[in-house]
A protein has these predicted regions:
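Short, well-structured hydrophobic secondary-structure segments
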Residues: 6-12, 19-20, 24-45
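Structured loop/turn residues at beta-strand edges in well-structured enzyme cores
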Residues: 5, 65, 112
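Vicinal oxygen chelate
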Residues: 31-43, 59-76, 82-127
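Amphipathic alpha-helical segments
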Residues: 1-8, 80-87
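A cross-kingdom feature marking solvent-exposed beta-strand/loop segments within repeated
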Residues: 14-29, 52-63, 67, 87, ...
Length: 127
């Protein structure tokens, strides 16, 4: 991919544990390897499931390959979750890695892939 598309080398992170993770509302421990790069202004994220009940394991158990989800960054994760819930779209999985908090929404049937919505948590200002 690097040569063909001219994208930078992938930055790799191994054995990353998702903090505060839930899968269908149940607390779980999820461990994943990640690799990140960019193609123009699009982030490419490769994931390799290591352990724990999760949408990643479910995807593999169903014999699927390829695109798992499309992610977007937002400023206020909770407001987006609320808006999707109003439309009948539920949260399937949640987690946090460092300051990045994210959810996966049940959009596969209507959108063709799961939608990941994430927010980078900001420092609280001292008053």
């Amino acid at each position: 991919m690097e040569k063909l598309y001219g994208i930078p080398k992938f930055a790799q992170m191994e054995n990353i544990t998702h903090q505060d993770a839930t899968y269908y509302g149940k607390e779980v421990e999820i461990i994943v390897d990640y690799a990140f790069s960019r193609l123009f202004n699009v982030q490419i994220e490769l994931q390799q499931w290591k352990s724990g009940d999760s949408l990643f394991k479910e995807f593999i158990d169903q014999g699927k390959e390829g695109l798992h989800s499309i992610g977007i960054y937002v400023d206020n994760l909770d407001s987006y979750i609320g808006e999707f819930k109003k439309r009948g779209i539920d949260v399937l999985q949640t987690g946090q890695i460092g300051k990045y908090k994210f959810v996966y929404l049940d959009t596969e049937e209507t959108f063709g892939a799961l939608l990941e919505i994430g927010e980078t948590l900001k420092r609280k200002r001292k008053k």
